[in-house]
């Protein structure tokens, strides 16, 4: 059976944890940050867990993660 290809776009955006979940960056922290509070920007800087409903799609895109 041939090797499965990894979706490179997904590989740059998601990282797998030891428990098999996937971590992602949060949205809304790219630009237009002047009016956002420091507390909000700190919160947006943290990683988030991919929702379980989307995790299966991410797993298919990253077969070796």
UniProtKB/Swiss-Prot annotation:
GO terms for molecular function: structural constituent of ribosome. Keywords: Ribonucleoprotein, Ribosomal protein. SUPFAM superfamilies: L35p-like. Transmembrane segments: none annotated. GO terms for biological process: translation. InterPro entries: Ribosomal_bL35, Ribosomal_bL35-like, Ribosomal_bL35_CS, Ribosomal_bL35_sf. It holds the Pfam family Ribosomal_L35p. One of its GO terms (cellular component) is cytosolic large ribosomal subunit. The keyword Transcription regulation does not apply. Belongs to the bacterial ribosomal protein bL35 family. PANTHER family: 54S RIBOSOMAL PROTEIN BL35M, LARGE RIBOSOMAL SUBUNIT PROTEIN BL35M. This is Large ribosomal subunit protein bL35. It comes from Prochlorococcus marinus (strain MIT 9313). The gene is rpmI.
């Amino acid at each position: 059976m041939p090797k499965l290809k990894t979706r490179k776009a997904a590989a740059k955006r998601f990282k797998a944890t030891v428990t098999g979940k996937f971590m992602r960056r949060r949205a809304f922290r790219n630009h237009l940050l002047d009016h956002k509070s420091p507390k909000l920007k700190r919160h947006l800087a943290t990683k988030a867990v991919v929702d379980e409903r989307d995790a299966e799609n991410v797993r298919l895109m990253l077969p070796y993660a």
